[in-house]
A protein has these predicted regions:
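Secreted/periplasmic carbohydrate-active enzymes, especially glycoside hydrolases
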Residues: 1-190
């Protein structure tokens, strides 16, 4: 059971002023995730590594390079021979690429699986006007036993800053930035 109370909030500055909330506690949905000791840790849960880190180092309308780095940890008392299978699909669920890699992970260690698609043909480029999203489904196996799955989404795009023009360049085109600042805690502030 969790008790989340801030009964004494007016002695915690600046709560009395009402401009910003300095607090602790649960402010978002919470899930309890139970995994096998050989698993893909959530991002930031293991020395700021975890999950899947996807980049697109080379992008054009004809093809792109996609790099998928996935971290797998072994919390078992013995080493494990781990296979990572990654399936990349388009927004409709059609398989674009299948990747496989194996390595031994010693007990209590984390390993990085570095997988790449050097020539991803005819990518749908992500932009604010066309936010096309691909999926990466990662599966962790020891032997033939599926131990963990992890789903990531990503857009294929190039992003650069033009220092001469002081503008963002997205997929080779100048893109204007728009945004807001909003405090999620209080609808009447921000």
């Amino acid at each position: 059971a969790v008790q989340n109370s801030l009964d004494d909030k007016y002695r915690i500055p600046p709560m009395n002023a009402g401009n910003w909330a300095v607090y602790g506690g649960i402010v978002r949905d919470v899930r309890l995730v139970v995994t096998d000791p050989v698993n893909i840790p959530f991002q930031g849960s293991y020395k700021h590594e975890g999950g899947t880190f996807i980049t697109t180092p080379e992008v054009s309308a004809k093809q792109a390079a996609v790099r998928i780095r996935t971290y797998v940890q072994n919390q078992r008392p013995d080493a494990a021979e781990v296979t990572l299978r990654t399936v990349v699909t388009d927004a409709d669920g059609n398989v674009c690429e299948r990747l496989n890699a194996s390595q031994r992970i010693d007990a209590g260690q984390i390993a990085e699986f570095d997988q790449s698609i050097p020539k991803f043909r005819k990518p749908q480029l992500w932009s604010p006007d066309s936010p096309y999203i691909y999926n990466a489904y990662s599966e962790v196996y020891v032997g033939k036993e599926l131990l963990d799955t992890y789903h990531s989404t990503f857009g294929i795009r190039s992003v650069a800053w033009d220092y001469d023009l002081h503008r963002l360049v997205l997929n080779g085109k100048v893109t204007h930035l728009h945004g807001i600042n909003r405090h999620e805690e209080f609808p009447w502030l921000g």
